[in-house]
Amino acid sequence: TDLKTNLLFLVNGLIKIYKYDKFDNEIFLYHIYSNSLISELSNINTNEIYCFSNASFIEDSVVLSIDFLKLQEHFLNNNLLVKELMSSLLKKTNQLQSLVNRELVFDATAKVAYMLVSDLKMFNNLKRQDVSFMLHIQPETLSRVLKKLSRDNIIEIENQQVIIKDEIALNSIFKGVAI
C-alpha cells in the first residue's frame, strides 16, 4: 500500500487496475474510464489516501492531481463539490460490487453477459484473448458462451463484432444473481 495526499482524477483516457497473486500472475480487477476518480478514498476525515492496487494506462490519458487538504479546506468543508465526490465514491463502490459478482457469484455466461451489457464497446475493441483474461475464463469458454448466446438469438456476431439483439434476455442472465 502506498500512502498519498493527493486525489487523482482521470480527466480522459483509460486505466487498468490490477493486482498480483502469490505466483506473480496479474489479476485484472477493473477499468477506470474518463471523468472518474482514480484514488481509493476510504475516509474523508483523514488526510491520507491509500493505493491498494496497481494501475497502468491503456491509452494516452490526462490525469488531474488534487491536493486533498486544499480540496477539503476550500470546497468540502464549505459543502461545495460534496455531491460530486460522493457520486465518484459510489461509482467506485459499484465497481467493487461488480468485481465481487464477477469473481464470486457469476458463472462464465453471466460474466460475459454482464460485460456485453455494461461495456459492449470495450468488448468489441479488445481481442477475445484479452476479454477472457479480464473475465478470468478460458478463451475456449468465452467462445462457447458467445456461440450459445448467438444460437439463442440474444446476440449476433458480424465481422468479430458483437451486436446485442435481445437486451432483456441478456440482462436476465445476470440480474437476480446478485445485482
Please provide the spans of the model-predicted regions.
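Cyclic-nucleotide recognition modules
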Residues: F28-M86
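Cytochrome P450 core scaffold surrounding the K-helix E-X-X-R motif
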Residues: I17-D24
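Polybasic "coupling" helices that flank or enter modular domains
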Residues: I58, L76-P139
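Conserved short histidine dyad/triad with adjacent acidic residue
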Residues: T1-D2, D21, I32-S36
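Regulatory nucleotide-sensing modules
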Residues: T1-N12
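Phosphate-/nucleic-acid-contacting segments
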Residues: F106, M115-I179
